Design a protein with these regions (language model features):
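Short C-terminal tail/terminal secondary-structure segment
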Residues: 209-238
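Residue(s) in the substrate-gating loop at a strand-loop-helix junction
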Residues: 122
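Alpha-helical segment proximal to the catalytic Tyr-Lys
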Residues: 109, 150-155, 206
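Conserved NAD(P)H cofactor-binding loop of Rossmann-fold oxidoreductase domains
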Residues: 73-78, 218
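C-terminal helical subdomain
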Residues: 161, 176-208, 215-217, 238
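Substrate-binding pocket helix/loop in short-chain dehydrogenase/reductase
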Residues: 80-91, 178
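Active-site helix of classical SDR
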Residues: 104, 138, 146
Length: 238
């Protein structure tokens, strides 16, 4: 794949999956514009702020004139119903759903021919652990936003989402139960996600839009019941 002279916007691109996506695009010749709250040689500010989004979009267009690919990757806050305040829940939705929506709206007049948006959701958009409501709601929201935008932007921009499962951003190689429990036989790493992002932005994915692709080593496809197929529930006594 060749992304020479393509302009890529990535939210949350300073570390983890976002940084890997940025590096892979750069290797293939793209110009990458990152916004993140973490310090670095990119646009540093808060994605939950409307004026910040407007200034960032203005800077990108003034400098590059157009956008080829928008990758909404920024990580929303994860807190549960016991501890999450109203303000924290709203913040998670602002970063995880409102910012992707508003950046899409701001860039809409400036998307180049063949443009694509990839939203990073999570396998938590379809399954949950206790005390993760803010994150889960944001990830479910962006998965739904994906197919809505795909229809609204039909003929102009393809819009897809990816739902990662367990992705170890330190590239740790796990053995034993952590690996064996995964149908794929291992824990994921950022390249598993970055490679799909590149594919979805390429011409090879030209007939794919409105889709959510779960990359989780098959974990969400397993039926897990105590005593079945070697699975055992061990309940911790409180």
């Amino acid at each position: 794949m060749d992304f020479k002279d393509k302009v890529v916007v990535i939210t949350g691109g300073a570390q983890g999956i976002g940084r890997c996506i940025a590096e892979e695009f750069e290797k293939l010749g793209a110009t990458v514009c990152v916004i993140d709250k973490q310090q670095g040689d990119h646009f540093v500010d808060n994605l939950a702020d409307k004026q910040v989004l407007e200034q960032f979009a203005k800077n990108v267009i003034e400098k590059h004139g157009h956008v080829d690919y928008l990758i909404n990757n920024a990580l929303p806050l994860m807190k549960g119903i016991n501890e999450c305040s109203y303000e924290e829940f709203q913040y998670a939705l602002s970063v995880g759903v409102t910012a992707p929506f508003y950046l899409t709206k701001l860039f809409a007049p400036h998307f180049a021919k063949g443009a694509a948006i990839v939203n990073i959701s999570s396998s938590r958009d379809r399954m949950s652990q206790p005390q993760t409501e803010s994150y889960t709601a944001a990830k479910g929201g962006i998965a739904a936003l994906t197919h809505a935008l795909a229809v609204s932007l039909a003929g102009k921009v393809r819009v897809n989402s990816i739902s990662p499962g367990w992705i170890d951003t330190a590239y740790t190689v796990y053995e034993g139960s952590d690996a064996i429990q995964q149908p794929a036989g291992r824990v994921g790493n950022p390249l598993d996600i970055a490679n799909m992002v590149l594919f979805l932005c390429s011409d090879k994915a030209g007939f794919i839009t409105g889709e959510n692709i779960c990359i989780d080593g098959g974990m969400t496809r397993q039926m897990i019941y105590h005593g079945d197929n070697g699975w055992t529930l061990k309940q911790n006594r409180q």
